[in-house]
Amino acid sequence: MLKTKRKSKKSKHKHSEKTTALSKKEVAAQKRKTSKKRNELVQAIVICCLVSAAVSIPLLFVARPKIAIAGGVAVAILQFSYKYPRQALWSFLIYLPFSGTITYAIGGGNAAFQVAKDAFYIPALIGLIQSCKKKQLPLFIPKEMLSTFSILLMMAMLTLIFVNGEMQLNPMKGDKPILQAILGLKVLIGYIPLIACTYYLIRTKKDLVFFGRMHVVLAIACCLLGLIQYLLLQSGKCAGTRGMTGEELYKATLQARCFVGGSLVFSPEVKFIRLPGTFVAPWQWAWFLISNAFLTFASAFCDPSFWWRVIGLFGMALVFANAVISGQRAALVMVPVTTAILLVLTGQFVNFKRFIPIGAGLAILLFFGAATNPGVVEQRWESFVDRWNAAPPQQFLFNQFEQSHNFIIDKPLGRGLGRATNSTRIFGFTQLIETFQPKLMYELGYPGMIAFQIMLLHLAFLTFRAYRAVKDKNLRSYGASFWVFVGFITINPQYYPLDVDPVSVYYWVLAGAILKLPKIDKQVQDEKHLELEGHELEVHDQLKEKKIIASAPI
């Protein structure tokens, strides 16, 4: 009996010695790996600096200093984004809400700055594709959507070849129909790969939580800048469109630009305000606020940390405040409606006590706002009611469909890719169509419009199925919050949010995040079933996380 006890003690001692030796080897290997990565980073920085200088110095002789420096920085970003796609995709999401401000503050409105975010996205996408090929991982996610996407792509290519191609044979003066079609196609489907990018970007629950927190911080930063912009205009430090006459009082202009963002309207004498926040145009700011009603809600009710939930609630309050002062009717209506819908559909109504602090905060904020700016909320509501009465949304949408139908009576494949896309006007004439489905009908005809809408509905179904398969309560709430946004944009008939920032990015990004939830849920469920305690559990979690990170393409 005594001998067996001694043997068991010796075996335990040997096992602990092996474990210690193994852990020492692992630590040494980790140190070598870290050192190698550090050296690679230093080398990459040196090369990027040299290439950037080689580009900037010659440009100084032919362009303004700002443009020359920006050109060099752009080349460095392209190199870095290709080498470090993961960091590039995070940078892409961070840069997005500030792109309008950077475009005018640094670029002076240069068109190149409006697509500068793609300097992060495109090289990162190329890097991801190469990494997926090496690790034999799927490139197109979700695989089930490949059929509907292929049909859409086929319809788009038919329009490009037979409609834009025909126009290219006999173009109008100044028109470049093929270039317009290529840019139009990029706007239409160029960000669909963000589904796969986000799917591989979010590897674990930690990444998902970081994703939510990052967007809350971005929302708070942008909303604070938006509040400052409003206060500067209200105090008269920025003139806005005060003192102008006739139509100029109602027209967004860059001459009225204030502090951040781009063109705006601020004509208090006629009770007409349209603020751009940190974006190029007021409509983009409205849809940023609507998008962040979903993103801040997700963190406010799903984040595992109490303090981050409080920060999320603060973000929701700021989004609501900006929806009131921005002058955007869509944001004024959709932000509170969205919050109410999310409370019901995500099942968070049972946690309504969490909503009490934000309710009290909003009440104080609105009371203070009403005291210092009497009539602001009333003006916004009156503006919304007047607009509704002047042009009811259902009638406006019907008129848009009728107009597009009349344009394509003799053109079954539409009028051409990019011909109703605002960002392609540098390559030729564009028709102003203010709603998305009629715009698709004008460009691609009935077949193309139906193909695109079917693809969106298919994606909405696949994401719904993915989030409903999740068992973990918190992850399911994240999925529900994200899916309501995807579902809303899928069936939204007003404006064309999928054509412009930020919705053209957020829609595909959140779809990718939802599709990853079942895998993250499996990781969480596996951890729950482990019968480990204390240090053993911590070591196991670290090893598992390392394996997940090592197997990921980025």
Predicted regions and their residues:
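Juxtamembrane membrane-water interface segments that cap and precede transmembrane helices
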Residues: 26-31, 102-106, 173, 260-278, ...
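Hydrophobic, aromatic-rich transmembrane alpha-helices
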Residues: 69-83, 121-133, 289-303, 449-470, ...
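Long extracytoplasmic/lumenal interhelical loops at the membrane interface
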Residues: 374-447, 463-470
